[in-house]
Amino acid sequence: MTVHFIGAGPGDPELITVRGLRLIESCPVCLYAGSLVPEAVVAAAPADARVIDTASLTLDDIIDEIVAAHDKGQDVARVHSGDPSLYGAIAEQIRRLKALGIDYRIVPGVSAYAAAAAGLGIELTVPEVAQSLILTRTAMKSSAMPPGEELTSLGRTGATLAIHLSVRNLRQIERDLVPFYGEDCPVIVAYRVGWPDEDYIHGTLSDIRAKVQEAKITRTALIFVGPALAQTADFRDSALYDAAHALSLIHI
């Protein structure tokens, strides 16, 4: 018996991996967070499968369902949104499974930041503009940021930032990042990426909060910040396409 933590992607059922879909199709038990994973993703479960929306369940409730499946020798598809390794809250589940001696595997999924970049038709790393992407969040009531991971520290890098779970903290984001990126730095708020009502709000550090308030977006949004978002035409081509680079490959 194995628990499969499956990344379902950001919302679009077509973005789940082949492996993830096959496991959902074969597992007799499927646990999914209905608030983040659309029913269309788990519709592929066997007709006689036990399919449970865990949105209202506690961690103990979820583990009880897994233990019950374990006692019956039934594999479990534990379906999470995006990629389970990023803000997936699987670490505490894995800790419980290890203590119980229950086997598990992780199936990666498409993260919201990758799907959003695709939806926007942009690259997040641009030669001589930004070559780093930082995935982060801001402190909320439920969880503080470890020392050194605050935006006032990360902003010093000048990297492209993908800020998760923080759309209600835009005032703080502006305050912390303007000293490093400037008021006119591009910002894009990606709302419900991969869902039918997906939307993108474009602005700058100085005006994005007002635009998001006008759009009445308060959750399920990802915030991109950084000069690479401008996608201007005046950046250097990647060395990957340089003639000398191509010639060096021929002589390897």
Language-model features and meaning:
Residues M1, D12, D83-T157, D199-H202:
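Class I SAM-dependent methyltransferase SAM-binding "motif I" and its flanking Rossmann-like core
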Residues A43-A44, G119-L120, D176:
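Residue-level signal for well-ordered alpha-helical positions
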Residues I252:
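Calmodulin-binding IQ motif helices
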Residues T2-V3, D61, K72-V76, S132, ...:
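A contiguous loop/helix-start segment that scaffolds small-molecule binding in enzyme catalytic cores
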Residues L21, A43, A68, T125-V126, ...:
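Short secondary-structure boundary/capping segments
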Residues E14-G20, P38, I63-E65, G121-I122, ...:
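A generic local structural motif
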Residues M1-V110, A115:
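Class I S-adenosyl-L-methionine
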